[in-house]
């Protein structure tokens, strides 16, 4: 609370700004108000104490206030006391308002007051600033009044900062404001003087300063809970104050005399409370304006954060005790007041182990892990964080320790001391909260990120944290929840942590488990966590993480990021916290997660530091991405866990969804699995994982691990998808199991892979077998190697963000893998920073390369058969890519099958698990391809297609690892969040709604459908002949996923024909385009995968023939990767995001499930229809394909196109979902991108962004992330797609013209921005292409908008919209509108130009947006 006041005073924004606190206020349980009131009561009590002290001093409390000025004057001189002075100022403020009351409470409470008062205000006024839990709890209610006055007074500072009125009040009250500035002399105005002196900046109102001063540590700790953010938020003054307080606090000892004088003068309160303050957060409001509570040696500011294993006795007030074993308390420690929710360890194993001797050991571990306890620096904030953590934890009831911890805990409570003390047990407890095991490794941090999405539900606080890896960073501190306060129940026997570098001792096994899950499982992923931000989406993974909450949960889980899926939100249940946290955004998840307990823990793990929580979180976040966290208690605990593990800070990333969404971004993301899981039936788990990704670096990585399990269960989840909560539960449970498996797996990716495999096997025996065959032993082996590499990579290179994305990616992949174990394997393996990479690299690439090189035929047949079987099977269907693989033979199969899962996950989620997996792997691969393939494309353009894919595989494998950090950060992060979105587009109801309400959408949809039908007919016939209905169905499924791609596919088919007509060279290029067209659409969709798209684009640009070969090869291999990758990513972003949105809500999940089936039916039916229609086009298509591509290209391309055509067909059949999604996606996308961050990714998931996945996360990130994520890719991808698109579009408009322009631009952009620009320019130039391609693929964003608008505006509308959506990905809001509306058409070139410029700039935008 103090923090609050600090925020209040320090933060001009105090009253409201305490968004953190507000968030605290929001506490899901409503404990916020309770806590606030309790704080107020505490404050009153303490005020009484202080007043007594004051009276002792000889100043009645009222007088104290009135006299306080004089007292304060005395105190004023005390610079050190100023911290207390801050409080005293509070008092003064109080005195201003409440002359009598404020003395004790005020001075001490200034922060408190600010906090308590604010708290009350918040509670009452809704003053979030009151978060300063420090004194808030302690500050008397009078203090509250005073706080208000104080706030006014303290506002002085604040006034400067924000509330001048209060300042004025304070000034009025504190006549000596002028003297405030006098450090030693507070005489002029006790109130102002002190503040002034304390806060040089707030000469007038030291309220904030004084709170800081009075809290010397409190400002940082209590005040800073909010203060940390407040430092940032209150920032100018608060920060300064904090710093001053810190320095002065340090000086405080020197100032102590002044402080003592304050005690003497103002009240003994200082004396009274001095010791209590130390003991009780009461901070003895040393009302004596000079309440120095003298920076006692015991003050954290002076002492620094309490070491984790420290056993402490806390004095406090019990605000509430529930029958379910939850205790809400305000405790004073080191003169800082912490509000926390304590859980009965007999009932809540997941709660931070109260028996952990070194509850903060996790924090320390975090530190060791690399986050270095980001919070620690702001040692004060930690409490807040802790509180927040507990809040996040999902101490649903007033877990709101956040109140005590100050809502800003997540990010704000970065102060170690604050966080630390409570951390002592909290951290551990929180960590334990994940059920200790794997749930909360530092994944939670990532998850937190993802949770960001999910945290959305938590409120900005969590979101803040989630959305920012840094917030997550502080999370660790937050984790420590004041609630835990005395959690470190001494245990007779201390259990030593077996970890080599860990010397933590825990009294309770849960503490150890929590610690291990958190610190050590995270250790591998911690770096990831560090780099990572979470969902998240769910971004995505974020985004998927991305994701988001409630819906978020979906986002966070699937939408979980929604947040991301981010995915950021956590459930109240302790175990749920992780998942809850992930889903926390989803209030639902809260309880479900809590119900899930261990499973949830796993999920929570995904959400939290653990893989499980991470997954959820990532996804949520995502996308990655955010439901889990909101599980209040669980969520809080978990979130704290998430936060706790510096992973989140690590993950400051990311979304992931997983984020990621995962998200999703999300989420992200949770960045971010959860998100995906929620988002799509198939990808639901993945989403959640991603979200626990969305959007969820380290956590995401872990989420990824759980993801395999999730993926294994995706189908199960799919059914669960309908009930987002149930699904999340399942996902969480599965994730939990996965995570638990992965917990160990984290260290051993092999295990992970196995785990992933096992779940996947369960999920898709065929898919898994197929994957196994495809990947063969090499896959597992490579997977492990890749995992290891990824782990190392994420630890070193990507540590912070990459892991999260990885997780997001992994989550997604894993989700994807429900059908394809390999993907999960990869996901699992990739778990770390290399989830996608590993997948792509090890399984996809390795398999493709191994299968392709060693046994293409083998792969082909195996894959073919497997693919067919898979297709036949629901999961197999998801594996439609295997069919394409058969088409593309070894490579395509490898990639398709491999990617397909991703793909499936990406769009349909459950529908195309393999597709999604493909997306994941492809996203990674594209990224990987970006470098290798770009190089290869250029260098090896002439090399055979096969060689190139192989090379791509091999070279990209390492590249992936190398790029993994980027990829993961970007792709995974995005995936985290993006994943969340992947489902969004599927929403039938939304589609229907749009159709009914949005004429433009309906028109576009109809156009798209028609276009799709025609093109699908053209290709469909061919494909049917080629692939057969089944393959086509699979393709359709994939098409769904790539529905944005589908238009390109459609475009491609016509384009191919036209291109072929254009000329052999051109035809060839178009051939490549078609091949790429297929890919490109996907690339477009997965703009985030710039590598591949750009590479393809470059290759195409470099050599049409080459491109043909490469396209054909790449198509099978890279393209497959691209398609799956980009498309999936894009799909995640565009489709998944909308889909996630759609599914952000349970309805979404149902939709996914029903849509899956419905799509299947539609696909079959439409496939048949298209067959008849296609027959006409087929010849064209065949000729086109044959002409366009090399022999392989024609076959693989055709196959691809076939599969893709079927996708268009699917698009047509699924047109409602798909087309709607295309149109819908743009809208949804725009939505996602606009609001998806929170709703989607954070939401959430990521929504990835579910982060959405992140993303930064899924939400915006989902689209933004998408843009940033695939920003490079976006351009390249789009260009690629555009290229492919142009083939199609060009055919409609001017193929040759488009191609020429394409080439022109390609060369232009090539030199300019080869990877992205090329494609982008091509794509843009390829306006015509954009028509079909644009509609089909986002890549047409620019091109479709520009070229297509003239040629096929109607058709382009949806396409353009998609493109715009893609564009949106790059430029969240900008394209959104154009995409949504026919602006692009109307905008024409300008829009295209903008898109081009945006896409061109996307790369630059890309990283930032991603983050």
UniProtKB/Swiss-Prot annotation:
<keyword id="KW-0597">Phosphoprotein</keyword>
<comment type="subunit">
    <text>Interacts (via N-terminus) with NIPBL. Interacts with INTS13; promoting association with the integrator complex.</text>
</comment>
<keyword id="KW-1017">Isopeptide bond</keyword>
<feature type="compositionally biased region" description="Basic and acidic residues">
    <location>
        <begin position="1097"/>
        <end position="1113"/>
    </location>
</feature>
<feature type="modified residue" description="Phosphoserine">
    <location>
        <position position="467"/>
    </location>
</feature>
<feature type="compositionally biased region" description="Basic and acidic residues">
    <location>
        <begin position="519"/>
        <end position="529"/>
    </location>
</feature>
<keyword id="KW-0832">Ubl conjugation</keyword>
<feature type="cross-link" description="Glycyl lysine isopeptide (Lys-Gly) (interchain with G-Cter in SUMO2)">
    <location>
        <position position="479"/>
    </location>
</feature>
<dbReference type="GO" id="GO:0006357">
    <property type="term" value="P:regulation of transcription by RNA polymerase II"/>
</dbReference>
<dbReference type="GO" id="GO:0045944">
    <property type="term" value="P:positive regulation of transcription by RNA polymerase II"/>
</dbReference>
<feature type="compositionally biased region" description="Polar residues">
    <location>
        <begin position="423"/>
        <end position="437"/>
    </location>
</feature>
<feature type="region of interest" description="Disordered">
    <location>
        <begin position="47"/>
        <end position="190"/>
    </location>
</feature>
<feature type="modified residue" description="Phosphothreonine">
    <location>
        <position position="746"/>
    </location>
</feature>
<feature type="modified residue" description="Phosphoserine">
    <location>
        <position position="470"/>
    </location>
</feature>
<keyword id="KW-0010">Activator</keyword>
<feature type="modified residue" description="Phosphothreonine">
    <location>
        <position position="381"/>
    </location>
</feature>
<dbReference type="InterPro" id="IPR013087">
    <property type="entry name" value="Znf_C2H2_type"/>
</dbReference>
<keyword id="KW-0804">Transcription</keyword>
<feature type="compositionally biased region" description="Basic and acidic residues">
    <location>
        <begin position="1195"/>
        <end position="1208"/>
    </location>
</feature>
<dbReference type="GO" id="GO:0007517">
    <property type="term" value="P:muscle organ development"/>
</dbReference>
<feature type="region of interest" description="Disordered">
    <location>
        <begin position="1005"/>
        <end position="1125"/>
    </location>
</feature>
<feature type="compositionally biased region" description="Basic and acidic residues">
    <location>
        <begin position="1020"/>
        <end position="1042"/>
    </location>
</feature>
<feature type="cross-link" description="Glycyl lysine isopeptide (Lys-Gly) (interchain with G-Cter in SUMO2)">
    <location>
        <position position="1297"/>
    </location>
</feature>
<keyword id="KW-0862">Zinc</keyword>
<keyword id="KW-0805">Transcription regulation</keyword>
<feature type="compositionally biased region" description="Basic and acidic residues">
    <location>
        <begin position="626"/>
        <end position="649"/>
    </location>
</feature>
<feature type="compositionally biased region" description="Polar residues">
    <location>
        <begin position="1286"/>
        <end position="1296"/>
    </location>
</feature>
<feature type="modified residue" description="Phosphoserine">
    <location>
        <position position="578"/>
    </location>
</feature>
<feature type="modified residue" description="Phosphoserine">
    <location>
        <position position="849"/>
    </location>
</feature>
<feature type="cross-link" description="Glycyl lysine isopeptide (Lys-Gly) (interchain with G-Cter in SUMO2)">
    <location>
        <position position="1061"/>
    </location>
</feature>
<dbReference type="GO" id="GO:2000291">
    <property type="term" value="P:regulation of myoblast proliferation"/>
</dbReference>
<feature type="compositionally biased region" description="Polar residues">
    <location>
        <begin position="549"/>
        <end position="563"/>
    </location>
</feature>
<feature type="modified residue" description="Phosphoserine">
    <location>
        <position position="413"/>
    </location>
</feature>
<feature type="region of interest" description="Disordered">
    <location>
        <begin position="1"/>
        <end position="26"/>
    </location>
</feature>
<feature type="modified residue" description="Phosphoserine">
    <location>
        <position position="358"/>
    </location>
</feature>
<dbReference type="GO" id="GO:0005634">
    <property type="term" value="C:nucleus"/>
</dbReference>
<keyword id="KW-0479">Metal-binding</keyword>
<feature type="zinc finger region" description="C2H2-type">
    <location>
        <begin position="495"/>
        <end position="520"/>
    </location>
</feature>
<keyword id="KW-0217">Developmental protein</keyword>
<feature type="modified residue" description="Phosphoserine">
    <location>
        <position position="804"/>
    </location>
</feature>
<feature type="compositionally biased region" description="Polar residues">
    <location>
        <begin position="798"/>
        <end position="844"/>
    </location>
</feature>
<feature type="region of interest" description="Disordered">
    <location>
        <begin position="517"/>
        <end position="659"/>
    </location>
</feature>
């Amino acid at each position: 609370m103090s923090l609050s006041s600090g925020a209040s005073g320090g933060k001009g924004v105090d009253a409201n700004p305490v968004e953190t606190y507000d968030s605290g206020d929001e506490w899901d349980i409503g404990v916020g108000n309770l806590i606030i009131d309790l704080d107020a009561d505490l404050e009153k009590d303490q005020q009484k104490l202080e007043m007594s002290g004051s009276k002792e001093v000889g100043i009645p409390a009222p007088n104290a206030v009135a006299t306080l000025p004089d007292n304060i004057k005395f105190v004023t001189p005390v610079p050190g006391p100023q911290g207390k002075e801050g409080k005293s100022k509070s008092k003064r403020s109080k005195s201003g308002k409440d002359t009598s009351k404020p003395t004790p409470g005020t001075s001490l409470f200034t922060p408190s007051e600010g906090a308590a008062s604010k708290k009350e205000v918040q509670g009452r006024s809704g003053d979030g600033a009151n978060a300063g839990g420090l004194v808030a709890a302690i500050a008397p209610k009078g203090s509250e009044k005073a706080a208000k006055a104080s706030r006014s007074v303290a506002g002085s500072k604040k006034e400067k900062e924000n509330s001048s009125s209060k300042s004025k009040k304070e000034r009025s009250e504190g006549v000596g404001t002028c003297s405030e500035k006098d450090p030693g002399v507070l005489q002029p105005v006790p109130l102002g003087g002190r503040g002034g002196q304390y806060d040089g900046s707030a000469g007038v109102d030291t309220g904030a300063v004084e709170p800081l001063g009075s809290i010397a540590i409190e400002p940082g700790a209590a005040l800073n809970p909010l203060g940390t953010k407040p430092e940032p938020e209150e920032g100018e003054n608060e920060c300064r104050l904090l710093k001053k307080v810190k320095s002065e606090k340090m000086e405080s000892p020197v100032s102590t005399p002044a402080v003592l004088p304050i005690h003497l003068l103002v009240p003994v309160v200082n004396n009274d409370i001095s010791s209590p303050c130390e003991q009780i957060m009461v901070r003895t409001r040393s009302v004596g304006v000079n309440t120095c509570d003298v920076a006692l040696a015991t003050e954290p500011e002076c002492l620094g954060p309490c070491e984790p294993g420290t056993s402490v006795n806390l004095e406090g007030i019990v605000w509430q005790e529930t029958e379910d074993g939850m205790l809400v308390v305000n405790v004073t420690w080191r003169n800082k007041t912490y509000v926390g929710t304590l859980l009965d360890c007999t009932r809540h194993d997941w709660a931070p182990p109260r028996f952990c001797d070194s509850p903060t050991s996790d924090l320390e571990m975090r530190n060791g892990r690399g986050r270095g306890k980001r919070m620690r620096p702001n040692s004060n904030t930690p409490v807040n964080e802790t509180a927040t953590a507990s809040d996040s934890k999902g101490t649903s009831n007033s877990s709101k320790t956040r109140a005590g911890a100050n809502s800003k805990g997540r990010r704000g409570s970065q102060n170690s001391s604050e966080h630390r003390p409570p951390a002592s047990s909290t951290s551990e407890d929180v960590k334990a909260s994940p059920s200790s095991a794997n749930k909360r490794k530092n994944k939670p941090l990532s998850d937190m990120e993802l949770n960001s999405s999910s945290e959305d539900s938590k409120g900005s606080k969590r979101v803040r944290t989630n959305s920012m890896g840094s917030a997550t960073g502080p999370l660790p501190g937050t984790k420590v929840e004041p609630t835990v306060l005395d959690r470190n129940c001494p245990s007779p026997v201390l259990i030593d942590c077996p970890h080599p570098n860990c010397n933590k001792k825990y009294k309770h096994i849960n503490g150890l488990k929590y610690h291990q899950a958190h610190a050590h499982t995270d250790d591998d992923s911690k770096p990831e966590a560090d780099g990572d931000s979470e969902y998240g989406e769910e971004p995505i993974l974020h985004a998927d993480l991305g994701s988001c909450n409630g819906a978020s949960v979906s986002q966070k889980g699937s939408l979980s990021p929604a947040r991301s899926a981010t995915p950021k939100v956590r459930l109240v249940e302790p175990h749920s916290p992780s998942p809850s946290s992930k889903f926390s955004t989803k209030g639902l998840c809260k309880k479900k997660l809590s119900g899930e307990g261990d499973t949830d823990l796993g999920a929570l793990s995904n959400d939290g530091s653990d893989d499980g929580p991470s997954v959820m979180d990532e996804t949520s976040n995502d996308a990655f991405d955010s439901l889990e966290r909101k599980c209040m208690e669980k969520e809080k605990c978990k979130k704290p866990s998430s936060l706790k593990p510096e992973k989140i800070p690590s993950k400051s990333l990311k979304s992931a969804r997983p984020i990621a969404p995962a998200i999703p971004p999300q989420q992200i993301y949770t960045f971010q699995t959860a998100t995906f899981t929620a988002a799509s039936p198939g990808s639901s788990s993945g989403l959640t994982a991603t979200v626990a990704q969305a959007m969820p670096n380290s956590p995401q990585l872990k989420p990824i691990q759980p993801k395999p399990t999730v993926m294994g269960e995706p189908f199960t989840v799919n059914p669960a998808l309908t009930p987002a909560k149930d699904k999340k539960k399942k996902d969480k449970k599965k994730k939990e199991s996965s995570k638990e498996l992965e917990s160990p797996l984290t260290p051993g990716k092999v295990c992970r892979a196995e785990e992933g495999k096992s779940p996947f096997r369960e999920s898709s025996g065929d898919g898994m077998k197929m994957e196994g065959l495809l990947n063969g032993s090499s896959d597992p082996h490579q997977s492990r190697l890749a995992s290891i590499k990824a782990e190392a990579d994420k630890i070193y290179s990507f540590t912070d963000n990459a892991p999260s994305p990885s997780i997001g990616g992994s989550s997604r992949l894993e989700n994807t893998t429900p059908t394809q174990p390999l993907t999960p394997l990869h996901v699992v393996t990739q778990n770390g920073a290399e989830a996608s990479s590993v997948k792509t690299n090890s399984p996809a690439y390795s398999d493709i390369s191994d299968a392709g090189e060693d046994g293409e035929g083998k792969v082909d047949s195996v894959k073919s058969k497997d693919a067919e079987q898979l297709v036949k099977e629901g999961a197999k269907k998801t594996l439609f890519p295997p069919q394409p693989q058969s088409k593309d033979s070894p490579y395509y199969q490898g990639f398709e099958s491999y990617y397909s899962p991703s793909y499936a996950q990406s769009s349909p989620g459950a529908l195309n698990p393999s597709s999604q997996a493909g997306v994941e792997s492809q996203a990674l691969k594209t990224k990987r391809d970006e470098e290798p393939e770009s190089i290869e494309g250029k260098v090896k353009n002439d090399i055979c297609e096969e060689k190139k894919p192989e090379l791509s595989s091999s070279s990209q494998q390492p590249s992936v690892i190398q790029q993994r950090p980027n990829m993961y950060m970007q792709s995974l992060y995005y995936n985290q969040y993006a994943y969340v979105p992947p489902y969004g587009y599927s929403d039938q109801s939304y589609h229907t709604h749009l159709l009914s309400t949005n004429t433009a959408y309906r028109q576009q949809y109809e156009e798209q459908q028609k276009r799709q039908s025609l093109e699908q007919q053209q290709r469909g016939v061919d494909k049917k002949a080629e692939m057969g209905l089944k393959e086509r169905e699979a393709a359709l499924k994939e098409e769904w996923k790539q529905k944005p791609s589908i238009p390109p596919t459609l475009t491609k088919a016509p384009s191919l024909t036209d291109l072929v007509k254009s000329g052999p060279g051109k035809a060839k290029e178009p051939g490549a385009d078609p091949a790429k067209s297929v890919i490109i659409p996907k690339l477009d969709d997965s703009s985030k995968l710039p590598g591949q798209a750009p590479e393809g684009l470059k290759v195409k640009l470099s050599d049409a023939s080459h491109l043909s070969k490469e396209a054909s090869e790449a198509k099978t291999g890279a393209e497959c990767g691209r398609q799956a990758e980009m498309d999936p990513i894009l799909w995640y972003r565009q489709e998944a995001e909308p889909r996630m949105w759609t599914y952000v809500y349970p309805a979404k999940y149902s939709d996914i499930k029903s849509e899956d089936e419905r799509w299947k039916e539609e696909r079959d039916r439409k496939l048949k229809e298209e067959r008849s229609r296609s027959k006409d086009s087929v010849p064209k298509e065949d000729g086109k394909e044959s002409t366009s591509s090399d022999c392989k290209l024609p076959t693989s391309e055709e196959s691809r196109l076939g599969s893709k055509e079927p996708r268009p067909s699917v698009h047509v059949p699924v047109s409602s979902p798909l087309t709607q999604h295309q149109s819908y996606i743009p809208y949804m996308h725009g939505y996602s991108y606009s609001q998806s961050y929170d709703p989607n990714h954070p939401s959430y998931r990521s929504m990835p962004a579910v982060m959405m996945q992140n993303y930064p996360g899924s939400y915006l990130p989902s689209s933004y992330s998408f843009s940033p994520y695939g920003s490079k890719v976006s351009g390249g991808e789009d260009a690629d797609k555009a290229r492919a698109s142009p083939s199609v579009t060009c055919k409609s408009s001017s193929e040759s013209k488009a191609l020429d322009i394409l080439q022109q631009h390609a060369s232009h952009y090539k030199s300019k921005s080869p990877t992205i620009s090329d494609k982008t320019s091509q794509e843009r130039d390829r306006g015509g292409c954009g028509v079909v391609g644009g509609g089909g693929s986002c890549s047409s964003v620019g091109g479709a908008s520009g070229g297509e608008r003239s040629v096929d505006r109607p058709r382009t509308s949806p396409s353009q919209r998609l493109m715009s959506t893609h564009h949106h990905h790059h430029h969240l809001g900008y394209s959104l509108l154009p995409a949504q509306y026919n602006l692009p058409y109307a905008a024409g070139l300008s829009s295209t130009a903008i898109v081009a410029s945006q896409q061109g700039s996307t790369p630059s935008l890309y990283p930032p947006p991603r983050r």
